[in-house]
């Protein structure tokens, strides 16, 4: 046991030694932010680009992500280039190395730890490769290690991402109130007239995103049904969003039953969804991509959350000037091994209605 503790101590000490000492000058450098997961995850990594641009205005920020998140990344004014991981992983090793090396990057930040990306970055000869010391494969693939553990952290995901920039001149902690200024989520494409014409200038246009494709605990269709029933129709125009598959599930219960509701599920590309949300007065959803899109755009975003760690709002709440969330103030882990969550379902439609009504002019 003593030997294990000693090895653990040396392991951590070495991690700190390998960490940056002082602020590295990245002015004029090409910096890759690697985050190859979902929409919400990518959005919460965008402030990293904003911070880098503030510290080093002439640096070039390249985002390594997946093709399906490309519209998110291209909406960010602080990102200069997008590079698709999907295309790289299709190639053989030699071509993959060549393609990554051709970016002429000076540094790569492994925000979402992925062994294949880390190994490729080393083989491509990227000079500075930054990863967290908590991932064993980073010890052999990175030459700069950051002491950062997300599992038990009390910080928000966006704050944890920004901690990776401390050794590049970033602050040790950014408050949730100051992070929105770094999103740069402003390059929104124009909304097509047929879609724009669906909006009501006299009512509150509310986008409801009831499902999550299993990525989050859900409020429940029954709760959404009751909410649609009690929201005043003279004050709200309701839109439903989701994939086509989700639309098949919710139409009989939320659209056919309430003919005044406009069904947008399966009808919008991600580019169009971003534009559409930018014209919404508010978005209601669980911890999903559309919720984080709304928050980053500065629209009213109301998230419905489970209190269980690590999916609680302390880690994944929407961040924005008009972002809010509802969660039961209790500790519970009953849904740890199942998708249905009693806590989030116990948030009443009346509570949600009351919160939304506060946003009316």
Model segments located where?
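Positively charged, low-complexity intrinsically disordered leader regions
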Residues: 1-27
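Active-site and donor-binding regions of nucleotide-sugar-utilizing enzymes
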Residues: 29-153, 272-275, 282
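A structural signal for isolated positions on well-ordered beta-strands in alpha/beta enzyme cores
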Residues: 32, 60-62, 130, 207, ...
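Generic beta-sheet signal
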Residues: 85, 111, 132, 241, ...
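Mid-sequence helix-capping/hinge segment at a functional interface
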Residues: 133-217
């Amino acid at each position: 046991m003593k030997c294990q503790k000693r090895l653990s101590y040396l392991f951590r000490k070495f991690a700190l030694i390998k960490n940056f000492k002082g602020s590295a000058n990245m002015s004029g450098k090409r910096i890759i932010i690697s985050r190859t997961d979902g929409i919400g995850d990518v959005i919460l990594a965008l402030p990293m680009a904003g911070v880098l641009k503030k510290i080093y205005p002439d640096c070039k920020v390249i985002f390594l992500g997946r093709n399906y998140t490309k519209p998110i990344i291209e909406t960010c004014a602080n990102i200069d280039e997008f590079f698709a991981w999907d295309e790289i992983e299709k190639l053989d090793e030699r071509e993959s190395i060549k393609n990554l090396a051709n970016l002429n990057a000076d540094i790569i930040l492994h925000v979402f730890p992925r062994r294949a990306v880390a190994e490729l970055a080393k083989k491509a000869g990227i000079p500075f490769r930054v990863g967290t010391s908590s991932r064993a494969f980073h010890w052999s693939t990175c030459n700069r290690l950051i002491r950062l553990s997300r599992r038990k952290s009390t910080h928000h995901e966006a704050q944890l991402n920004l901690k990776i920039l401390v050794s590049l001149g970033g602050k040790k902690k950014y408050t949730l109130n100051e992070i929105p200024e770094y999103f740069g989520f402003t390059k929104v494409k124009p909304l097509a007239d047929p879609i724009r014409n669906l909006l009501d200038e006299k009512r509150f246009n509310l986008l409801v995103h009831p499902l999550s494709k299993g990525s989050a605990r859900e409020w429940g269709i029954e709760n959404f049904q009751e909410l649609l029933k009690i929201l005043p129709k003279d004050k709200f125009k309701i839109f439903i969003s989701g994939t086509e598959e989700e639309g098949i599930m919710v139409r009989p219960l939320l659209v056919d039953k309430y003919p005044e509701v406009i069904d947008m599920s399966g009808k919008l590309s991600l580019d169009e969804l971003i534009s559409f949300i930018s014209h919404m007065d508010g978005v209601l959803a669980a911890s999903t991509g559309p919720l984080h899109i709304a928050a980053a755009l500065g629209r009213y975003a109301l998230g419905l959350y489970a209190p269980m760690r690590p999916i609680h709002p302390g880690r994944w709440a929407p961040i924005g000037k008009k972002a809010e969330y509802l969660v039961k103030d209790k500790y519970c882990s009953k849904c740890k091994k199942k998708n249905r969550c009693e806590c989030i379902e116990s948030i009443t439609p009346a509570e949600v209605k009351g919160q939304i009504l506060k946003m009316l002019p």
